[in-house]
Amino acid sequence: MNISMGISSLSVINGSALPRHNWAREEAQALYDLPFPDLVFQAQSIHRTSFDPNHVETASLLSIKTGGCAEDCGYCSQSAHYKTDVKATKLMAHDDVVATARRAKESGAGRFCMAAAWRNPKEKDLERICHMVSAVKELGMETCATLGMLTREQADKLRAAGLDFYNHNVDTSPEFYGKIITTRTLQDRIETLAHARESGLKVCCGGIVGLGEQVEDRLGMLVLLANLAEHPESVPINQWNEVKGVPVNATAEAPDPIAFVRMIAVARIMMPKSVVRLSAGRQYMSDEMQALCMLAGANSIFIGDVLLTTKNPQTTKDAALLERLGMTSRFDEVATDKANPVSSRAI
């Protein structure tokens, strides 16, 4: 039996995908190198053991504090180290955040993520964010935050406020990491993930492809994530968006669409119970490419015209694509509620 074929087949026992935490780079590479039909077939087969293959999760992302970040992430328009078009703002007002969350829910989002461009939150700001989290939770939405590094005590406060998920990406492989970030170590990120876990928060953690890394780096990132003590509940995969004024522009190049789909498929096989999210960069993807990603196991998208400081497909376009594919999402629930306003208010 071909070893690469055996790797994924051994991940499914009695119809259930069993997560592993001891992946080797060679195994990830063997999966990636499979003939495309075999790779996508295996990914879809494993996907079906844990998820409804015809359902896509929809989430919304809001920058509640933009720009002026002390970190030097070489891809980020919000870093204070670079001259970009992004202007630094203060933390948004509570009522504005809640109103945005309400509109996101009415548009079809089931989860609302609040992002702040900080190295780490100050206590006075964290208190305000905890109130925002509680208010968004009262709307009946799942809550997520990405605020930079956290202490265990800060994670505990967010969890007590009702936060469900904490996002803190590893961005890339351990080998490539130092080429794009110098002000925050990869270990800093791992420790923040541990603090979130210890507090009872679910973890959202992924990275970016197209920063100038090699395929081995992309697979190295997936191996890093898959070998964590617990797999992230959500794995966002971002495709590089060109940003004016950042140093990564010198080496960045969006991956070939087939290469990106292969990345999604390997992520699905290696982390069979994690939600795999198509994140930034979808505005550059054709409908056909997104459909292939979903066939390969991607089952979540961010909706809304803007993701932090970058563009995103219009919500109406996303709804139309999922309808064409015959896939379900919260868009269907919203449409039903609008068609039956009396009954939906009574629920």
Curated annotation (Swiss-Prot):
Residue pairs linked by disulfide bridges in the UniProt entry: none
Single GO term (MF): 2 iron, 2 sulfur cluster binding
Span of domain Radical SAM core: 54-273
Pathway connected to this protein: Cofactor biosynthesis; biotin biosynthesis; biotin from 7,8-diaminononanoate: step 2/2
Keywords of the record: 2Fe-2S, 4Fe-4S, Biotin biosynthesis, Iron, Iron-sulfur, Metal-binding, S-adenosyl-L-methionine, Transferase
InterPro entries on file: Aldolase_TIM (IPR013785), BATS_dom (IPR010722), Biotin_synth/BioAB (IPR002684), Biotin_synthase (IPR024177), Elp3/MiaA/NifB-like_rSAM (IPR006638), rSAM (IPR007197)
Binding of [4Fe-4S] cluster, residues: 69, 73, 76
Assigned EC number: 2.8.1.6
Entry annotated with the keyword Protein biosynthesis: no
Alphabetical list of HAMAP family matching this protein: BioB (MF_01694)
Subunit relationships: Homodimer.
Chain's role: Catalyzes the conversion of dethiobiotin (DTB) to biotin by the insertion of a sulfur atom into dethiobiotin via a radical-based mechanism.
Protein name, per record: Biotin synthase
Organism field: Afipia carboxidovorans (strain ATCC 49405 / DSM 1227 / KCTC 32145 / OM5) (Oligotropha carboxidovorans)
